[in-house]
């Protein structure tokens, strides 16, 4: 089976869809940005993904759906630093430092998430900014954004 488009996301399930059998494809965070890949479901079925559109996969994306079954993207947990700045000043300081290192970050209402790096952990300790080292699933890929200093 070759998957060429995402047919929905479980976050938008209707009541009738909640009873369907769900087969999962577990992906590493770095695989969420790959448009073309071969994967194996948790039931041992091999499928190809060749997305027509250049979009990233996300947790809960439905790759295939029929009347009784569906194949859904799940994401393996990631080794993260969960940064919890107490003030706008702390948030600005650490965001500036991480930006200078070109580290991709994700944000919740109260946290900044970055992939674990012992140098960043040392920086957080030195700056006295609260953080936790966790294994956590993230919904989207950490994406590097290219730029130049022209």
UniProtKB/Swiss-Prot annotation:
Where does the source fall among the domains of life?
Answer: Bacteria
Entry GO CC: cytoplasm
A Gene Ontology annotation in the biological process aspect, one of them, is: urea metabolic process
In which compartments does the protein localize? Cytoplasm
Record gene name: ureE
- What's one Pfam family the UniProt record gives for this protein? UreE_C
Main function: Involved in urease metallocenter assembly. Binds nickel. Probably functions as a nickel donor during metallocenter assembly.
Q: Which NCBIfam families match?
A: PRK13261.2-1
Instruction: Give the primary localization class.
Output: cytoplasm
Q: What is this protein called?
A: Urease accessory protein UreE
Which UniProt keywords are present, listed alphabetically?
Answer: Chaperone, Cytoplasm, Nickel, Nickel insertion
The entry's family comment says:
Belongs to the UreE family.
One GO MF annotation is: nickel cation binding
């Amino acid at each position: 089976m070759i998957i060429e488009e995402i047919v929905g996301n479980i976050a938008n399930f209707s009541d009738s869809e909640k009873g369907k059998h769900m087969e999962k494809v577990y992906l590493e965070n770095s695989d969420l940005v790959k448009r073309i890949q071969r994967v194996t479901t948790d039931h041992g079925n091999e499928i190809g993904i060749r997305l027509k559109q250049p979009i990233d996969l996300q947790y809960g994306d439905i790759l295939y759906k029929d009347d009784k079954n569906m194949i859904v993207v799940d994401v393996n947990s990631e080794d993260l630093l969960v940064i919890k700045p107490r003030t706008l000043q702390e948030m600005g300081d650490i965001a500036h430092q991480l930006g200078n290192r070109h580290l991709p970050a994700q944000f919740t209402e109260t946290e900044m998430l970055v992939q674990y790096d012992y140098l960043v952990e040392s920086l957080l300790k030195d700056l006295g900014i609260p953080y936790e080292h966790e294994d956590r699933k993230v919904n989207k890929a950490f994406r590097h954004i290219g730029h130049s200093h022209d």
